[in-house]
């Protein structure tokens, strides 16, 4: 108990990879491959976890991101390389209901 299931870790990794890729390429796509390496347990009852992602390769329509998930002790617990096939923006808008990159960069309104 209190250990984050590997499938949930993979879901978090896939999600953060998509944000990195979508913001880098300004369009949407779909996951085509994900290679995950589980190195340490991730506890859910002893502190916060965090992830970071970086686009590492762009080869035409295939974009790769490397993702790292850190456990509650700030140790690298899981890492993955995630490959997405991206679509031209017009296709992404039609097939994936892509709202456009601007939807992800709306300025935060100042409090009055």
Where are these regions (language model features)?
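Hot-dog-fold acyl-thioester-processing enzymes
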Residues: 1-19, 96-112
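Conserved beta-strand segments that form the floor/walls of ligand-binding pockets within enzyme
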Residues: 3, 31-37, 50, 64, ...
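Amphipathic, positively biased hydrophobic alpha-helical segments used for protein targeting
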Residues: 13, 17-22, 29, 64, ...
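HotDog/MaoC-like acyl-thioester-processing domains
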Residues: 42-45, 56-112
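Hydrophobic beta-strand-centered segment that forms part of the acyl-chain substrate-binding groove
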Residues: 16-50, 55-56
């Amino acid at each position: 108990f209190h250990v984050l299931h590997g499938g949930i870790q993979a879901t978090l990794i896939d999600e953060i990879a998509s944000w990195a890729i979508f913001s880098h390429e300004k369009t949407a796509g779909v996951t085509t491959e994900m290679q995950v390496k589980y190195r340490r347990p991730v506890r859910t009852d002893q502190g916060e976890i965090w992830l970071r992602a970086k686009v590492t390769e762009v080869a035409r329509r295939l974009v790769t991101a490397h993702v790292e998930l850190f456990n509650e002790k700030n140790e690298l617990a899981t890492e993955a390389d995630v490959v997405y096939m991206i679509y031209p923006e017009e296709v992404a808008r039609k097939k994936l209901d892509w709202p456009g990159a601007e939807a992800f960069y709306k300025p935060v309104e100042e409090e009055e």
